[in-house]
Amino acid sequence: LAGLGWAAALLHLWNHALAKAALFLGFGAVAQGAGSRSLDALGGLLRRWRLVGSVLVIGAAAIAAVPGLNVFASEWLLFRGLLGGMMALHGVAQVALLGAVGALAFSGGIAIACFARLVGIGLLGTPRSASAAGAPPPGWAMGGPVLLLGAACVFVAAAPSGVVRALAAAVGIVAPAADIATASSALRPIAMLLPAVAAAMALLAVLRRAMGRGAPVRRAMTWACGYAAPTAAMQYTSTSFGDPLTRVLHPVLRTEARVELATPAGAPPGARTLVRRWTSVTPDRLL
């Protein structure tokens, strides 16, 4: 169990370093190109930022531990180690490991919601501002490192057992008697997930292309319940997307809602804009 636990911890550290670095650099390029770090001022970037945008999607899916990517492999090892410890230990230690399993599962759910909002609001839809509509794709000096980090995430997902074996020397420093053979063998079936997911996506792409062959292609706005002139302002905002989860986690986040009614510039008399914001009452220094 010692070898499994240390291998899982080090692999998880490496996976988070790769995925988070890709996300930080990628969305730094987004902020630089669009001139804003506000999700509500972004949108519509994935179509024009195909390479960097695709890496951001991969990085977000990886950090949310989606099966087939690198962070899922290390989380799988962490769960294996925690559950193995629960079966081997008793009393307070067993309860503590049970709490760790719950905390890991809870944080995974929060990560999925967080990065679904990041990608869905920041990259998809239509541009929510003029700066987002005209944001130029980053050059190779800025986009190249993002692509390399995305490739590293895919490499670890494809060969997690080899990466764990490469970490054997580091594990031996903190746990000289540890054996990482269990960790390496536990990851062999996980390595098959990435080819399986890639094959399924390729099959869907081929079927879609075959079914649409010869049919005219027309681009249009998304369905808006019959409304013929939707605007970018009618899309989900980051606040509205996260509102259900924010309400559920209110006792933990200690948030409060602020509702403002404003009159848009140039609007007819009586027109109002509803603005709803969630703010945290917890000082930022404690977060």
Model-derived features: positions:
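Alpha-helical transmembrane segments of polytopic integral membrane proteins
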Residues: 20, 24-27, 36, 75-76, ...
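Short amphipathic alpha-helical coupling elements at transmembrane boundaries
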Residues: 40-47, 121-128, 172, 222, ...
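Interfacial and helix-entry/exit segments of alpha-helical transmembrane bundles
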Residues: 28-86, 93-107, 130-155, 228-234
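Predominantly late transmembrane helices and immediately cytosolic-facing juxtamembrane segments
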Residues: 20-24, 97-137, 192-220
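Hydrophobic transmembrane alpha-helical segments of multi-pass transport and channel proteins
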Residues: 13, 17-21, 106, 110, ...
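Aromatic-capped, Gly/Pro-kinked transmembrane alpha-helices
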Residues: 160-193, 209-287
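Alpha-helical multi-pass transmembrane bundles of energy-transducing inner-membrane proteins
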Residues: 1-39
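Membrane-interface segments at the starts/ends of alpha-helical transmembrane spans
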Residues: 2-4, 85-100, 176-192
